[in-house]
Regions:
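Glycine-rich, charged/polar anion/phosphate-binding loops
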Residues: 22-23, 112-113, 146-147
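Residues that cap or flank secondary-structure elements
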Residues: 32, 93, 140-141
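Glycine-rich, aromatic-flanked loop segments that form ligand/cofactor-binding clefts
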Residues: 98-138
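Structured beta-strand/loop patches that form or line metal/cofactor-binding pockets in enzymes
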Residues: 1-43, 47-48
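Conserved residues at the C-terminal ends of beta-strands
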Residues: 2, 52, 163
Length: 171
């Protein structure tokens, strides 16, 4: 597992609510941490996964030794055994490992993972998304969300995902 960091500008935790949601905050700088999982085979092939949380990777310590010497192409066997090992946990660490094993399979078979999974589409529609609503001059009103949605539509997006205010009243 490798970690890397980068700086995001104009982004900060929402201090007005719970400190977990990221919101637009002009002038703010936020250091973010990312992770790369690499699984190396005895044949010299490396499977990669980029993403995941610190908690996901902490769980991997429970079953990392199990992976040593296993056939990485036996993804279902590995999945079922690890599922049992993590039966009392949320199993969030299984996804990154599974994707890295699929990456190995793609490299072994000389095909992209989407082909191994039976994919046929050459493109997929994209959508625009927001950070959470805030109260600091970013997406701070329904009108601001509407203006941003119109701007995204002008940029060619045909769908728009809203992350509203976390502290909004439940209706």
């Amino acid at each position: 597992v490798h970690t890397y960091q980068w700086e995001s500008r104009d982004l900060a935790p929402d201090d007005d609510y719970n400190g977990y949601n990221l919101v637009y905050k002009p002038g703010a700088k936020l250091t973010r941490t990312g992770r790369i999982l690499q699984i190396h085979t005895g044949a010299g092939i490396t499977g990669d996964f980029v993403g995941g949380s610190a908690g996901d990777y902490a769980q991997m310590g429970i079953f990392a030794r199990y992976l040593i010497g296993r056939d990485p192409l036996q993804r279902e066997l590995i999945f079922n055994d690890v599922k049992r090992a993590l039966r009392k946990l949320d199993k969030m660490s299984m996804g990154p490992v599974d994707i890295a094993l699929w990456d190995i399979a793609g490299k072994v078979h000389g095909a992209p993972v989407w082909q191994l999974l039976g994919g046929w589409k050459k493109s997929l529609p994209a959508y625009a998304s927001t950070y959470h609503g805030d109260e600091n001059g970013g997406l701070d009103t329904p009108e601001a969300f509407a203006d941003f949605a119109e701007q995204c539509c002008e940029m060619g997006y045909r769908a728009f995902k809203i992350h509203g205010w976390s502290h909004a009243p439940i209706r």
